[in-house]
Amino acid sequence: MSSAKPVLDPAFQGVGQKPGTEIWRIQDFKPVPLPKADYGKFYNGDSYIVLQTTCSKGGGAYLFDIHFWIGKDSSQDEAGTAAIKTVELDTMLGGRAVQHRELQGYESDKFLSYFKPCIIPLEGGFASGFKTPEEDKFETRLYICKGKRAIRVKEVPFARSSLNHDDVFILDTEKKIYQFNGANSNIQERAKALEAIQHLKETYHNGVCDVAIVDDGKLQAESDSGEFWVLFGGFAPIGKKAICDDDVVLETTAPKLYSINNGQLKLEDTVLTKSILENNKCFLVDCGSDLFIWVGRLTQVEERKAASAAVEEFIATQNRPKTTRVTRVIQGYENHTFKSKFESWPVNSAGSAGAEEGRGKVAALLKQQGVDIKGASKSSAPVDEEVPPLLEGDGKLEVYCVNGSAKTALPKEELGKFYSGDCYIVLYTYHSGDKREEFYLTYWIGKDSIPEDQEMAFQTANSIWNSLKGRPILGRIYQGKEPPQFIALFQPMVILKGGISSGYQKFVEEKGLKDETYSGDGIALFRISGTSIHNNKVLQVDAVSSNLSPTDCFVLQSGNSMFTWIGNASSYEQQQWAAKVAEFLKPGVAVKHCKEGTESSAFWFALGGKQNYTSRNATHDVVREPHLYTFSLRNGKLEVTEIFNFSQDDLLTEDMMVLDTHGEVFVWMGQCVDAKEKQKAFEIGQKYAEHAAAFESLSPDVPLYKVVEGNEPCFFRTYFSWDNTRSVIHGNSFQKKLSLLFGMRSESGSKSSGDGGPTQRASALAALSSAFNPSSQKNKGNDRPKSSDGGPTQRASAMAALTSAFNPSAKPKSPPQRAGQGSQRAAAVAALSNVLTAEGSSQSPRIGDADTAELTPSAASPLSEGASEFSADKDAPGDGALSEGGRTEPDVSVEQTANENGGETTFSYDRLISKSTNPVRGIDYKRRETYLSDSEFQTVFGITKEEFYQQPGWKQELQKRKHDLF
């Protein structure tokens, strides 16, 4: 008896077993794995399948996205093969991937986020033959760039008629790359186009060519502008933008639901609810600009293929534009975009009964076909608790209790006591690693507090925030949802029953309620459940023995007597904390310690007698991936758009954005956002929390923060690969990007920023570095001609630029700067600025630390008179320059350290940790892990370096902190 032959393609055997990207090209109607060296290269005559595997933050099963990309010259048969093979790949992965159709030039933001900064499809294909850039003679090309974050680069005819006033264009010539900014073009699109220029420069010019900016409508007598127009046959007016069919984007419409049966679509006249989606059927949700195919878990593979084909036919017969997005989701694994099309989405876990049933059937099907599904899922192994980033210690803590229109400062001995009937304002002033004064400002809302006190707490906190010029991060925290950074400020934090404000007392009296406010001479029971500095919150509970639990420790107050009760299953940390809490509540009183089972009669008497009790099941918040969104308000309804694979570069200074970590929600505000809009941050944040509560099980009482660009705290930065030097460069998005990538300044930038400050100095240092290090610009192997080093002329230009930076009153017009080595110049800028702005420092910056040196921010604005009560202590601890971790470091370079170690380029883990007793000197302290050998790296992190750097930046940072490599 012969076994059944697998119908699934063997090219997909064993895929999806680790995070990262895998790509196949369709060749002779079969998927062929693409070499990793060719990732990001797409030929317009081919079709591709792209699998993106990600590891969820909470562990458990991997998450999969499958994209099939269709080149504009790809044949219909190849495109159809890609669609069918995508379904097979999904089946191989257990049938839970989200599938996306991608047309060349109209790719989704998520797809483009895998290939930053952009993709520029190449001519040719497998059938017609490939043309590589190396084989081609250099040809001048004109590109149009669109997109504020995910940039779409499209080649257009090299002619003046292609230009317009509304878009951004890149003209790539053999010796120079020009960016033409249409007069009406978007500032953020101009900034993203610079990233495309950097990509062209590195890919086709070996990193060595000049870059020039040409502004539409500005006819200065500049050589760059003149050269640009000469290439088009001389200057002449350009026409208005012509709208073509490919630019048509349908508006998002009210969703329509179609059932799909035997390849036929039927419009369902019903309200769109989750309950009508049957697990043995496929459905189409038509939203105009977006189409979603929903697939029930119990459908067969052939049914899924037929549904995809039916939707393709639907698009053709409806004559939908190419910009129409098509996404296929599986029951139980619907993405946020799909769920948001419904009025609400009752939350069930992805591993619901229906999902598990379907997954089991798919697994059985694969086994029958002899397919190895070893890599289809990842077991849910327990995850070690990770201590989140906490605020620097030794700061100044001020706490105020709201009492009507007044606020009362708590004395030092009362700090940490919170009554559930009251509201509080907390201001913590501290100094970060670079000695900068920072503020953590929050207002805490007790669960039994009255609305008037809640409103007064918000108004007072907002007034303080305004008086401090928006520098603090401002948070709203509800009782029971305290974030770790808040809890860690108080050692201990104890939540007491009742309230002491006049408003609460009046409310209790008017309602005839029993006043349960904590009294120092009464009977009270406190539960200690936390085990670490960031979660050791203590809660007063009803003083009855049924509230005891073997997994916790308790403190019992009975008049002047104090008991600690130690559960048999409690931890050593809880036991220590119980003794500390008892001393905090009753300083100097002798504490009677009793273990579970050894209680005295006095103990039981205080609790009203002995009763049965059981172990309390501790609840843990679901760990979710962080998400970054842009948003808009339409008719009062919040609409959000996700930024995929986000980074610090996505925080654009003209925007307000929402970062949802599931543990807290941040509303981030760029410096260029209007002041009136900034005042709406909490309103926006609350609307988002309500929106996410309906679809993603987010609590509407989640901690809510607003933070202004340049004042991001450590627990916000940890979700990004953060570079402090970026936050001190002033200007709009375009000006910042121009300075960061090329050390250049735009004409508009000079007008808006006075003498230029850091931007001008960046330009000066870039020119100086380029002039005196011409060897750094050597050819990397490309045979194309490159511009000369410049010699004395370039050095003269560099000295002129440097002189201008140090003498802002003298502003000679500098010649265009060379545009090489963006990252190298950024490092040089940081080193130079450190020299220029460091105050009270007794040492000079080390060459080995140039790429990690931080720029000193501008001085803090003085507080207003009305905020004097909340003013922070200005005395910064310590003196002298400190490296990361607060240690004074000797002036030693990496090279010298390597020589002392016999030429080693790697170091042992014990020497690289931040608390090492024998630290390595002169390394990049922000990238300690890079100095580990490959074998020791895998021993420490449990994964290879390649796998580590494929993870999101925030996840890398958390793991580095866990292993003391930060």
From Swiss-Prot:
Ca(2+)-regulated actin-binding protein. Binds actin microfilaments (MFs). Involved in actin filament bundling, severing and capping. Caps the barbed end of actin filaments and is able to sever them in a calcium-dependent manner. May regulate cell expansion in developing organs. Required for the regulation of plant architecture via the modulation of polar auxin transport and root gravitropism. Keywords: Actin capping, Actin-binding, Auxin signaling pathway, Calcium, Cytoplasm, Cytoskeleton, Repeat. SUPFAM superfamilies: Actin depolymerizing proteins (SSF55753), VHP, Villin headpiece domain (SSF47050). Its main location: cytoplasm. SMART domains: GEL, VHP. This is Villin-2. Disruption phenotype: Malformed organs, including twisted roots and shoots at the seedling stage, mainly caused by asymmetrical expansion of cells on the opposite sides of an organ. Increased dynamic actin cytoskeleton network. Hypersensitive gravitropic response, faster recycling of PIN2, and altered auxin distribution. Mostly expressed in growing tissues. Residues 894-910 have a biased composition (Polar residues). Residues 818-838 have a biased composition (Low complexity). One of its GO terms (cellular component) is cytoplasm. GO terms for biological process: actin filament capping; actin filament organization; actin filament severing; auxin-activated signaling pathway; gravitropism; regulation of auxin polar transport; regulation of cell growth. It is found in: Cytoplasm, Cytoskeleton. The keyword Repeat applies. InterPro entries: ADF-H/Gelsolin-like_dom_sf (IPR029006), Gelsolin-like_dom (IPR007123), Villin/Gelsolin (IPR007122), Villin_headpiece (IPR003128), Villin_headpiece_dom_sf (IPR036886). GO terms for molecular function: actin filament binding. Belongs to the villin/gelsolin family. Residues 901-966 form the HP domain. It comes from the Eukaryota. Gene3D superfamilies: Severin (3.40.20.10), Villin headpiece domain (1.10.950.10). Pfam families: Gelsolin (PF00626), VHP (PF02209). PROSITE patterns: HP. Gelsolin-like repeats lie at residues 29-112, 150-221, 273-338, 414-487, 535-604, 645-716.
